[in-house]
Amino acid sequence: MQRAFTSSRASVLSSASSTRAPLSRFRSAGVGLQQQRFAHKELKFGVEARASLLKGIDTLAKAVTTTLGPKGRNVLIESPYGSPKITKDGVTVAKAVTLQDKFENLGARLLQDVASKTNEVAGDGTTTATVLARAIFSETVKNVAAGCNPMDLRRGIQSAVEAVVEYLQTNKRDITTTEEIAQVATISANGDTHVGKLISNAMEKVGKEGVITVKDGKTIDDELEVTEGMRFDRGYVSPYFITDTKAQKVEFEKPLILLSEKKISAVQDIIPALEASTSLRRPLVIIAEDIEGEALAVCILNKLRGQLQVAAVKAPGFGDNRKSILGDIGILTNATVFTDELDLKLEKATPDMLGSTGSITITKEDTIILNGEGSKDAIAQRCEQIRSVISDPATSDYEKEKLQERLAKLSGGVAVIKVGGASEIEVGEKKDRVVDALNATRAAVEEGILPGGGTALLKAAANGLTSLNPTNFDQKLGISIIKNAITRPARTIVENSGLEGSVIVGKLTDDFAGDFNRGFDSARGEYVDMIGAGIVDPLKVVRTALVDASGVASLLGTTEVAIVEAPEEKVPAGSGAGGMGGGMGGMGGGMF
């Protein structure tokens, strides 16, 4: 028995030692694969590189441009989770595309970046930017292949873009009426007048700088909810302050407001405010960095006994931003903010230092102040101060975002558009259109409007480039590239409507070149005054699309080398079997 055990053990040891060689081969093969995977790159040069990039750009642009115009088609996109997505939003389509060939995918990704950047700045115009970038790059590639200097072509392109932007800014029209706002929103929502009216109503109620958000609704119909006043994301400190147990919220009419930048813990700090609340028979709301200890206990005790109506809320924001928001609330409610800088003590508060508002609603998560009794002039002055800081070049993007939020809360209110629909797919598609329409409307309010349907760019091609004086022939070709490229959006819109684009574009640039507003209504198939017909584009959208597209496309034209990661090479199928064969041989040797 002992002998058998020893023999068996020797056999296993023998087989283990004999398998070391094939294991080392596996390890060396793994190292080789890693070297292949991380060290190997593929390069393409010159015409071949630009041709691959152009092929990728053409593929992506073909998918995106089908959505352009009133008769543009939808795109169905597979989703890794849940239902497929149906959309007519250019940037959504662009982001969904990944190509198998890595060089082609490089071009597609650059075009995706153009669409994303345009969407980020203007909120719309991504399809127009894609059309322009494709047209500019394809013409640049042809001219570079013919022997033109790519740097001079780029200089000509950039000078032409600057001239077009200047021409558009000269001929823009400021948006003034609710009807014009509705027209802009309707066009961007693919001709949906209901969406246009919804957005114009929201903007009318909360102001042009008011906060408008878009959310998924829970019913079939679209809904608009408007909060007129200031809302911030801080709720009650203790549930003992609740006045409406069913809705779990605090509601006061005509409350007094006490504002403090510091924590309140000592009871003597709030006694003057509590006495004012009692004598005036009005509720008291304390907004401070925090309220704790004896001060909080006294407030809760008085509330539970029914001796006075009181509630406490933590101040919104952090650091300097909290200080600024408290100042905004002070202006809105005509309250004094107790701060260290003013050397004001809470125990010396007088009734005239307390603010006042029409009503206040406090939930667990947020507080809404309605109809603050602050001076209209003081509020307007505060808004102007915030605008001046926003326009300061030294202000960071993060600070601008916070300042915009403060300005919106002071100047208007908050509107929520709840998008309804019968299914998740329908709600998602409609929500994309509503967001596009909202972004386009904001852009129109900010910089003005132009005749839509690509008309403004067509007229710029006919009239906006005549004053340029290129220094050489290649720069002249660069200007010509832009002149041809900016006719492409109008041509694409017409072709998506099933008509002959070159004929209609030719008529607009030849017969109607002198009439800036005269364009072609692709939905009805008529030549009309585009502004009069309500077919408009925001200047900011058109300008951003052209600048972004020309910048990337002309830079691509100067590309001489493209480098990508080489595809991973698979391990040959026979290598694993060979290793096993060696192992089996070793086992056989051990047995004998």
Curated annotation (Swiss-Prot):
Keywords: ATP-binding, Chaperone, Mitochondrion, Nucleotide-binding, Stress response, Transit peptide. GO terms for cellular component: mitochondrion. Its main location: mitochondrion. PROSITE patterns: CHAPERONINS_CPN60. GO terms for molecular function: ATP binding; ATP-dependent protein folding chaperone. The keyword Mitochondrion applies. The keyword ATP-binding applies. SUPFAM superfamilies: GroEL apical domain-like, GroEL equatorial domain-like, GroEL-intermediate domain like. Pfam families: Cpn60_TCP1 (PF00118). It is found in: Mitochondrion. NCBIfam families: GroEL, PRK00013.1, PRK12849.1, PRK12850.1, PRK12851.1. Belongs to the chaperonin (HSP60) family. This is Heat shock protein 60, mitochondrial. It comes from Paracoccidioides lutzii (strain ATCC MYA-826 / Pb01). The lineage of its organism: Eukaryota, Fungi, Dikarya, Ascomycota, Pezizomycotina.
